[in-house]
Structures are given as C-alpha cells and as structure tokens.
A protein has these predicted regions:
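TPR/TPR-like (Sel1-like) alpha-helical repeat modules
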Residues: 221-227
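Transmembrane-helix signature of 12-pass secondary carriers
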Residues: 1-221, 249-351
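Surface-exposed helix-capping loop/turn segments at secondary-structure junctions
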Residues: 227-231, 251
C-alpha cells in the first residue's frame, strides 16, 4: 500500500506541473528586465520603479483571485477540471505577454495578470489533488514534491533567461526572441498539463463527497492497484465516506438556519466556511497560525529577491545584465540543492 505505482507517478508528475509553473513565473520577469531589447522596447516600464513594481505585483493580484476561487471551483467542477482552467489561464497569459508591442506595454500587464490567475488556481488545487490521490502514509512526502517542482521552475527560469539573453547578441542587435522565449516556454508545461489532465483520474475524495461512491471506489482501486474488495481499499474508502458524512452533519449543526437547498449548495458551503474560520477561537487560532507562517515567510523578502535578483546583483557591482543573470542562475542552483537535500532527508526518514 505504501508504494507508488506507475499510474500514480504519472498523475503526481502531471499534477506537480502546476508547482513548476508557479516557480517558473517567479523567476522569468527579472531576467527580462535587464535584457537590452526589453529595455529598448519598454523604457516606460524599466525606467519607472512604480511601473516595474506594478508589472511584478499584478501577477500577485491575479494570484489572489485564482487562489480564492480555486476552492469553490475545485468543489463544484472537480480538482481535475479546475486545474485544466488554470492551464488555460497560464497559456493565455503567456501569449498575451509576448504579444506586447514596441512602446506599448499594456499586454505585458494583461499577460501577467492572467498568468497570476492561473498559478493562483494551481496553488490552491494542485497540492490538494496530489494529497487526495496519494497513499495516506506517503501523503506528506508527496505534497512536498509540489514545492520541489516550484524550485525546479525557479532555477530553470533563471538559466533559460541567461541562455536566451544571447539570442542576437547582448547589445543593440539583440532579438526580441531573447525576452519572449522564456515566456513562450512558460506556456509549454501548462499546455502539456492541459492535454495530460484528461488521462488523470478524478480525486476519489471528491467523487465520494459528490455521492459517486461506485466511481470513487473504482478510482481508489485503480490508484492503489488492489481489488475493490481488498481490506486496505475498503478501509480507505470508508474513512473518506465517514469524513464526508461528518462534514455534512457538522455543517448542518453549525448553520441550522440554512434551508436544505442552501445546505446542499457548494457555493453557500464554501462561503460559510470562510465565516466558520473566525466564528470560533479554536478555528481562528489554527488558521492564524498557518497564515502567519506564510506571512512571515513572504515578509522575509524571499519573493522580492527571486523577482528582482538580476537588479539586486547589478546594484552590488555586477555590471551588465549578463553577469547579473549568471549570478542569479547560481542562486537558483542554491535553491535547488537546499530543497533536494530536505526532500532526500524526508524520503530517508520515511524509508
């Protein structure tokens, strides 16, 4: 039961592409900002700290929208189809971005916003999908690979940007493809995921919560490569079913004034859950703890370093975009080595 079969490996790999996209888009903009052709095409963006800040942060605004709505859409349309919609947003955003014309950066902002919606949706539903299809005893380790995929995305965006900087030379003859290619590549994993997702199973937990017990049991049997009547499959199936029943009864108890129709509405349930977060001190304390951990992680400035690494290296004396981009690539390798070290320790601990 504790091993991962090839079908699960494929599902988890495809599901983790969302993490790759999240990491890749974090690193791809900073590389463009120091490229000669990008600076010549969009001086109003590069020469204005405010415009550069907006181009960076508008992706986060899209991410807020995507992450907030991913829970609702994931419950209504399934985790699988919600990830498909995220792919579409990322592909749309990527190709709007490269469609920006000389001295007209509006498409840059539109592309970054829609990409943000996509990666925000991925962040909400991708790890959830991986957790729900993974064997219970491997769930924590499997979900951590989403972060591993994120780090790979960051590192590759740094090195792809460094390599593409040489297309047409690093001077005035530099090709537009130098800053466009990294963003074109950004859309490739999303397109692969959009195709591959049709071969992924639905989350068994989602199926059972929707009352599709027979499909949920078949999916569990398929994922675990065990017969439907095997005791381990039956135990996991009954645990999920009991949890779904508990959630329904708990919701009815906490919101007795809602009608039966309102209680069966996924949208009403999801909105009510946000209220439930602050309704009791215990819930608020748990959510606040998780929220503050992520808040202070961001407060450390790590994302700002990732977004503006080339400019930071230029400011400390690495003149010329090429040297700064090389130093940024080395930073990506440090991220990767640090992450894989922790992942290997987690794997060895489990084994």
């Amino acid at each position: 039961m504790g091993r991962i079969c090839y079908d699960q490996e494929f599902s988890l790999m495809i599901g983790s592409l969302g993490g790759f996209e999240y990491g890749y888009q974090q690193g791809v903009l900073g590389q463009s900002l120091v490229m000669t052709r990008f600076k010549d095409n969009f001086p109003s963006v590069v020469e204005s700290a405010s415009a550069t800040g907006w181009l960076t942060s508008i992706l986060q605004l899209g991410g807020i929208l995507g992450s907030i709505t991913s829970g609702v859409f994931g419950e209504i349309f399934s985790r699988k189809y919600t990830m498909f919609s995220a792919c579409c947003w990322v592909v749309l955003g990527s190709y709007l971005y490269i469609g920006a014309s000389y001295h007209n950066p509006a498409m840059l902002y539109a592309g970054r916003f829609f990409t943000g919606v996509g990666v925000g949706t991925f962040s909400g539903v991708g790890p959830l999908y991986n957790a729900e299809i993974a064997p219970p005893e491997l769930r924590g380790m499997i979900v951590s690979f989403y972060q591993f995929a994120t780090i790979i995305g960051i590192m590759l965006s740094f090195w792809i940007g460094y390599a593409s900087n040489y297309i047409g030379g690093i001077g005035e003859g530099q090709s537009n493809l130098a800053w466009q290619l990294p963003t074109i590549i950004q859309g490739v994993p999303a397109a692969i995921l959009a195709i591959g997702i049709w071969w992924l199973p639905f989350s068994p937990r989602w199926l059972i919560k929707k009352g599709r017990d027979e499909e949920g049991l078949k999916t569990l049997s398929y994922l675990r490569k065990l017969p439907q009547d095997h005791e381990l499959v039956q135990v996991e199936f009954l645990e999920i079913k009991a949890e779904a029943l508990f959630e329904r009864r708990s919701f009815a108890k906490n919101f007795p004034n809602l009608s039966a129709k309102e209680q069966s509405s996924v949208l009403v349930k999801e909105v009510a859950q946000y209220y439930q977060i602050v309704r009791t001190w215990d819930n608020f304390k748990r959510v606040s703890t998780a929220w503050l951990v992520m808040f202070f992680q961001q407060w450390s400035g790590i994302d700002a370093i990732i977004y503006f690494a080339p400019q930071i290296f230029e400011s400390v004396g690495l003149t010329g975009g090429t040297q700064a981009m090389l130093a940024t690539g080395v930073t990506g390798v440090v991220f990767f080595v640090s992450t894989i070290r922790k992942c290997c320790k987690s794997l060895c601990h489990h084994l």
